């Protein structure tokens, strides 16, 4: 396990490996983003520090490598910034600024790469925005109301299957856009693209928490069924699955409440292990057994 000490001068809010697992991006209340080269399991090197935000940086998200070396970040300053590394110089620069929100942008997430360079943002102004970065260098965005008191996180659904040749045109792919958001209204909501009105409409409402939902994560792979995890201020994590009739069913990850607030939840790439971090300074790992119950798979003490 690689442990990076003194990575920032203030609280670290996110740490994300790139597609190949070779580079780590971290962000902090010190308003900066650090890029580390990770070599194996023991060594690392700080290669870049990115500054451009005017407030704490909450989250970072790597784009798929087919778009180049691109990173999105979001901040309390109400902006999402898009950074690109020039391969010749290995220098990073801001190539786009998304500033449509009126409050802190709490979450940024790139869509599955088959859908194009599309960024999803969730903000404390209660709105969610979806930004398309078009091939001709232009951008277009859709902004809509999602959670009345504030949107805290958002996560894309995986594509249900590999599109057939006649589904690969832009219009058909756009129809497959789905994501889940969560907010300070104690809810998570699933949204789908509405082509007729060029916006996103609520497909399902996931009710089960009794306090703010801090994070939501849609399992990245389609196994026997699809999973959504929600982590809440109420010290519980819920696992949501869709039954044959299309209705979403909830299950407590564990019958006992967590010792403190559940801040974040994250699926493994294969979608079969869930990591949960909370106010108790621990990261716990969970997996589903053959009986459909979730059981502990270990923990990492910070």
Swiss-Prot record:
<dbReference type="GO" id="GO:0051028">
    <property type="term" value="P:mRNA transport"/>
</dbReference>
<keyword id="KW-0256">Endoplasmic reticulum</keyword>
<dbReference type="GO" id="GO:0051664">
    <property type="term" value="P:nuclear pore localization"/>
</dbReference>
<dbReference type="Pfam" id="PF00400">
    <property type="entry name" value="WD40"/>
</dbReference>
<keyword id="KW-0853">WD repeat</keyword>
<dbReference type="GO" id="GO:0005198">
    <property type="term" value="F:structural molecule activity"/>
</dbReference>
<dbReference type="GO" id="GO:0031080">
    <property type="term" value="C:nuclear pore outer ring"/>
</dbReference>
<keyword id="KW-0968">Cytoplasmic vesicle</keyword>
<dbReference type="GO" id="GO:0005789">
    <property type="term" value="C:endoplasmic reticulum membrane"/>
</dbReference>
<dbReference type="InterPro" id="IPR037363">
    <property type="entry name" value="Sec13/Seh1_fam"/>
</dbReference>
<keyword id="KW-0931">ER-Golgi transport</keyword>
<keyword id="KW-0509">mRNA transport</keyword>
<dbReference type="GO" id="GO:0030127">
    <property type="term" value="C:COPII vesicle coat"/>
</dbReference>
<dbReference type="GO" id="GO:0045893">
    <property type="term" value="P:positive regulation of DNA-templated transcription"/>
</dbReference>
<feature type="repeat" description="WD 2">
    <location>
        <begin position="52"/>
        <end position="93"/>
    </location>
</feature>
<dbReference type="GO" id="GO:0070863">
    <property type="term" value="P:positive regulation of protein exit from endoplasmic reticulum"/>
</dbReference>
<dbReference type="GO" id="GO:0006606">
    <property type="term" value="P:protein import into nucleus"/>
</dbReference>
<protein>
    <recommendedName>
        <fullName>Protein transport protein SEC13</fullName>
    </recommendedName>
</protein>
<dbReference type="GO" id="GO:0090114">
    <property type="term" value="P:COPII-coated vesicle budding"/>
</dbReference>
<feature type="repeat" description="WD 4">
    <location>
        <begin position="162"/>
        <end position="201"/>
    </location>
</feature>
<feature type="repeat" description="WD 6">
    <location>
        <begin position="257"/>
        <end position="296"/>
    </location>
</feature>
<dbReference type="GO" id="GO:1904263">
    <property type="term" value="P:positive regulation of TORC1 signaling"/>
</dbReference>
<keyword id="KW-0811">Translocation</keyword>
<keyword id="KW-0813">Transport</keyword>
<feature type="repeat" description="WD 3">
    <location>
        <begin position="100"/>
        <end position="141"/>
    </location>
</feature>
<comment type="function">
    <text>Component of the coat protein complex II (COPII) which promotes the formation of transport vesicles from the endoplasmic reticulum (ER). The coat has two main functions, the physical deformation of the endoplasmic reticulum membrane into vesicles and the selection of cargo molecules. It also functions as a component of the nuclear pore complex (NPC). NPC components, collectively referred to as nucleoporins (NUPs), can play the role of both NPC structural components and of docking or interaction partners for transiently associated nuclear transport factors.</text>
</comment>
<comment type="similarity">
    <text>Belongs to the WD repeat SEC13 family.</text>
</comment>
<dbReference type="GO" id="GO:0032527">
    <property type="term" value="P:protein exit from endoplasmic reticulum"/>
</dbReference>
<dbReference type="InterPro" id="IPR001680">
    <property type="entry name" value="WD40_rpt"/>
</dbReference>
<dbReference type="GO" id="GO:0036503">
    <property type="term" value="P:ERAD pathway"/>
</dbReference>
<feature type="repeat" description="WD 1">
    <location>
        <begin position="7"/>
        <end position="46"/>
    </location>
</feature>
<keyword id="KW-0472">Membrane</keyword>
<dbReference type="GO" id="GO:1902953">
    <property type="term" value="P:positive regulation of ER to Golgi vesicle-mediated transport"/>
</dbReference>
<keyword id="KW-0539">Nucleus</keyword>
<keyword id="KW-0653">Protein transport</keyword>
<keyword id="KW-0906">Nuclear pore complex</keyword>
<comment type="subunit">
    <text>The COPII coat is composed of at least 5 proteins: the SEC23/24 complex, the SEC13/31 complex, and the protein SAR1. Component of the nuclear pore complex (NPC). NPC constitutes the exclusive means of nucleocytoplasmic transport. NPCs allow the passive diffusion of ions and small molecules and the active, nuclear transport receptor-mediated bidirectional transport of macromolecules such as proteins, RNAs, ribonucleoparticles (RNPs), and ribosomal subunits across the nuclear envelope. Due to its 8-fold rotational symmetry, all subunits are present with 8 copies or multiples thereof.</text>
</comment>
<feature type="repeat" description="WD 5">
    <location>
        <begin position="208"/>
        <end position="250"/>
    </location>
</feature>
<dbReference type="GO" id="GO:0061700">
    <property type="term" value="C:GATOR2 complex"/>
</dbReference>
<dbReference type="InterPro" id="IPR036322">
    <property type="entry name" value="WD40_repeat_dom_sf"/>
</dbReference>
<dbReference type="InterPro" id="IPR015943">
    <property type="entry name" value="WD40/YVTN_repeat-like_dom_sf"/>
</dbReference>
<keyword id="KW-0677">Repeat</keyword>
């Amino acid at each position: 396990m690689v442990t990076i000490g003194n990575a920032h001068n203030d609280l670290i809010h996110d740490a994300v490996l790139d597609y190949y697992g070779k580079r780590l991006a971290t962000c902090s209340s010190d308003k900066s983003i650090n890029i580390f080269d990770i070599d194996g399991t023991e060594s690392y090197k700080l290669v870049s520090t990115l500054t451009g935000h005017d407030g704490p940086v909450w989250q970072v998200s790597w784009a798929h490598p087919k778009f180049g070396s691109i990173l999105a970040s979001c901040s309390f300053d109400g902006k999402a910034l898009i950074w690109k590394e020039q391969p010749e110089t290995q220098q990073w620069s801001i190539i786009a600024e998304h500033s449509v929100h009126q409050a802190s942008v709490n979450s940024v997430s790139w869509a599955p790469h088959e859908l194009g360079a599309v960024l999803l943002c969730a903000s404390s102004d209660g709105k969610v925005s979806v930004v398309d970065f078009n091939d001709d260098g232009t951008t277009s965005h859709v902004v809509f109301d999602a959670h009345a008191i504030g949107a805290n996180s958002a996560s894309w659904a995986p594509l249900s299957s590999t599109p057939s040749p006649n589904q690969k045109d832009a219009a058909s792919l756009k129809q497959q856009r789905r994501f889940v958001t969560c907010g300070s209204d104690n809810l998570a909501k699933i949204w789908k693209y509405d082509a007729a009105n060029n916006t996103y409409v609520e497909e399902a409402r996931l009710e089960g928490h009794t306090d703010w939902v801090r994070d939501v994560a849609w399992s990245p792979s389609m196994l026997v069924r699809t999973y959504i995890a929600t982590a809440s201020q109420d010290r519980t994590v819920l696992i949501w699955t869709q039954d044959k009739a299309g209705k979403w069913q909830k299950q407590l990850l564990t019958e006992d409440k967590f010792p403190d607030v559940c801040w974040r939840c994250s699926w493994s790439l294969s979608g079969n292990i869930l990591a949960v971090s909370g106010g108790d300074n621990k990261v716990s790992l969970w997996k589903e057994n053959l009986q459909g119950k979730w059981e502990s798979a270990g923990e990492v003490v910070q």
